[in-house]
Regions:
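A glycine- and charged-residue-rich anion-binding loop/surface
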Residues: 1-262
Length: 262
């Protein structure tokens, strides 16, 4: 019938939504303006199928922690050293559709920086005295603990291991982290103090910086920001390091606290 010919399959609208992010409400409105109707039931059916696929892909299961040492406090030494002699306090096996089987290791102390504040975690390896090397492909945070991710367990778990952070990778991350602060200051200097950092993602390859501003930057603004950042890099300003500074003093000294950052 003519009414059936004017009914557009929901699968077509879902492809627009899923692939290009085109809102289904807008698709429906455009179709209605042209005398067509969207089969919203079949659209919702496709949406549920996609949600189910995503749920299954994200399925992850954790084995219980296997505790080797009763040592609940973990020390981070990675600001001063990229190597440390460590013991494995506990470990567990994790299964997921995405990564297969991996292991999570907790050390009594660690030079590995765990993913935090938009900065990715360190990578590297641990090595035993008998030459057993296990690669650490990520470091994440769970509560106050740094957790080290690896594809394999060491052959012997009760040894002392030399934990080594990939120094070149860490240095690239540090450079990009510093660049976010330079960029933030450049934006505030050039666009105004209303600019606030809304989020960031810092890796060894690049960084993303999200910020608030009331309009799109024009080319002259972009060039000014680039010149500001590049001039500070070329000046090679000495770093003044301060640790464990009270919040009030840090803010009085000009630190900008962005506690809602993601």
């Amino acid at each position: 019938s003519s009414s059936n010919n004017k009914l557009i399959p929901g699968k077509k609208a879902f492809e627009l939504y899923d692939t290009y992010g085109f809102p289904v409400d807008l698709t429906n409105l455009i179709l209605e303006e042209r005398g067509f109707n969207l089969d919203i039931e079949s659209f919702n059916s496709e949406l549920e199928k996609q949600k189910d696929r995503s749920r299954k892909a994200a399925e992850i299961s954790f084995d219980d922690w296997m505790v080797l040492i009763d040592d609940p406090v973990q020390e981070f030494v990675g600001y001063d050293s990229l190597e440390a002699n460590v013991k494995i306090v506990k470990y567990r096996k994790v299964k997921s559709k995405k990564d297969g089987i991996i292991f999570q290791l907790v050390f009594n102390l660690t030079p590995f920086y765990a993913e935090s504040g938009g900065q990715i975690g360190d990578i590297g390896f641990i090595e035993s005295n008998d030459g057993d090397v296990v690669h650490i492909h990520d470091t994440i945070k769970e509560g106050s603990l740094s957790i080290h991710l690896t594809k394999n367990l060491p052959k012997k778990l009760d040894l002392i291991f030399r934990a080594v952070v990939d120094s070149k990778n860490r240095f690239r991350i540090q450079c990009n982290h510093t660049a976010t602060h330079l960029l933030h200051q450049a934006l505030r200097n050039i666009l105004g103090n209303h600019v606030e950092q809304k989020g960031s993602r810092v890796s060894s390859e690049n960084f993303r910086f999200d910020f608030s501003h009331y309009s799109k930057l024009d080319q002259s603004d972009i060039i000014s920001v680039e010149n500001f950042v590049n001039s500070r890099i070329e000046n090679s300003i000495d770093l003044i390091e301060e640790r464990n500074v009270p919040l009030k003093k840090a803010q009085d000294d000009g630190a900008i606290g962005l506690f809602g950052e993601k």
